[in-house]
């Protein structure tokens, strides 16, 4: 998936700012990984939330099985977790020729960790809000 940052400018200010994945709708702003899908072993007991254009001005909240929304604390932001799909593509069985400039970043600020309160959770919904009034939601089911 190729993504580009899109800026909407009005006068001398940014009116909106988001990522746009090639062949994906503008609303596609995050991907949720289920238990066991993290690249790092220590995070495989929970969910990994990849919020593509996250910035410190965003709010990230989770809702487990339709309970109340909970804002994720700042320590849930992972600084050294790779995106699983990028990792598998670059280092998996069908990996392309080694190109250091094209490999997934191991140091990023848009991956979050959330461990559901209940081991028998059914659905976790993530809501990410940016300062431009955009609210993005995505859900994952426990299968």
Please tell me what each predicted stretch does.
Residues 79-115:
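Aromatic sugar-binding surface patches on proteins
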